[in-house]
From Swiss-Prot:
Keywords: Electron transport, Flavoprotein, FMN, Transport. It comes from the Bacteria. This is Flavodoxin. Belongs to the flavodoxin family. Its cofactor is FMN. It comes from Buchnera aphidicola subsp. Schizaphis graminum (strain Sg). Pfam families: Flavodoxin_1 (PF00258). GO terms for molecular function: electron transfer activity; FMN binding. Low-potential electron donor to a number of redox enzymes.
Length: 154
């Protein structure tokens, strides 16, 4: 049985690319990659360790496949599960909503007893939104801006 489930949603391919890079770094011998559009509650519950890739769309909206899965996600008890987050956004064109969807998923996980690990420094990012912040110095997970800072993705 694989130990880590990597779940992502992606419309443009940026979050998928990041998920594939993470999967490759961790290794396919201990991790499994899932597109959120093709998963069930059982898929989530079969892992004790999860990495979730959540892009933000337009005006702070959650990506459509994550939005479809959200009612199921809200019913999962994440007690005894460790979760790390990463998200893609556009800090130039959508600075007022930068990675907001990551913050929305973070709140659901926190409410449902997840042990959330990882954070990412806010330095070198230009944004106005605070939904994805753990505190003033850190985001709730890794944030990526493939359009403005593609060199940071790898």
């Amino acid at each position: 049985m694989k130990k880590i489930g990597i779940f992502f949603g992606s419309d443009t391919g940026n979050t998928e690319k990041a998920a594939e890079l993470i999967h490759k770094k961790i290794g396919s011998n201990i991790s499994m990659l899932y597109d959120i559009s093709n998963v069930s509650k059982k898929d989530f519950e079969s892992f004790d360790h999860l990495i979730l890739g959540v892009p933000t769309w337009y005006y702070g909206e959650i990506q459509c496949d994550w939005d479809d899965f959200l009612p199921i996600l809200k019913k999962i008890n994440f007690l005894h599960k460790t979760v790390a987050l990463f998200g893609c956004g556009d800090q130039e064109d959508y600075a007022e909503y930068f990675c907001d969807a990551l913050g929305l998923i973070y709140q659901v996980l926190k409410k449902n007893n997840a042990k959330i690990v990882g954070k990412w420094p806010t330095i070198e990012y230009n944004f106005e939104s605070y939904k994805a912040l753990l505190n003033k110095d850190y985001f709730v997970g890794l944030v990526l801006d493939e359009a403005r800072q593609p060199e940071k993705t790898e």
